[in-house]
């Protein structure tokens, strides 16, 4: 029993010393975190899970310190790496570049309506004292009737009537009458603010806006009953 206890004690002491000292090849072991390691260089994958392995997302020929200027496409993970074509452009950058490519977005220069090429000498040579002969002439002054040019059309100038037709028998009345206009009732309609008088909410006088016009109209017709 004594020999067994002594052996166990020596074994525990040796393990404690080994934990205190640590592994002897720490600085030369592959994959260590020190810069003296020859297996992996201190780069982006360090301090990440499974950092001692090669990343699958990186292309196989991605080597910054490589002296080869031409990439080997057979070893690349993606076909895009190592090609001589221009770099990819993001969608936002492509849309912002439309200002320089799209002609519709370019600022347009404003040009005058009349210049040396488009100016007709007949406009300046026309005598303003001559009477106008039609709608095709440029009026130098405003006509006496402002609405006369609105009724002058190509159809009325080219297709003139053969006969002089008499005016209509019943001419249109120019006066505007409010006799037959229905007013808001003071008794049957609901109370509202659109009323005449001092008290606009309770106006029961029976006098409306067209009462005077109705009295004049029905007085000529000799109607004894004058409606309100």
From Swiss-Prot:
The keyword Cell membrane applies. The keyword Transmembrane applies. It is a single-pass membrane protein. InterPro entries: CFAP95 (IPR027905). Residues 140-228 are cytoplasmic. Highly expressed in the testis. Weakly or not expressed in embryonic stem cells. Residues 1-122 are extracellular. The chain crosses the membrane at residues 123-139. Residues 123-147 are annotated as: Disordered. One of its GO terms (biological process) is flagellated sperm motility. Signal peptide: none annotated. Residues 152-162 are annotated as: Mn. It is found in: Cytoplasm, Cytoskeleton, Cilium axoneme; Cytoplasm, Cytoskeleton, Flagellum axoneme; Cell membrane; Cytoplasm. One of its GO terms (cellular component) is axonemal A tubule inner sheath. Pfam families: CFAP95. Keywords: Cell membrane, Cell projection, Cilium, Cytoplasm, Cytoskeleton, Flagellum, Membrane, Transmembrane, Transmembrane helix. Microtubule inner protein component of sperm flagellar doublet microtubules. Interacts with MYH9. Interacts with MYH10. Microtubule inner protein (MIP) part of the dynein-decorated doublet microtubules (DMTs) in cilia axoneme, which is required for motile cilia beating. This is Cilia- and flagella-associated protein 95. It comes from Mus musculus (Mouse).
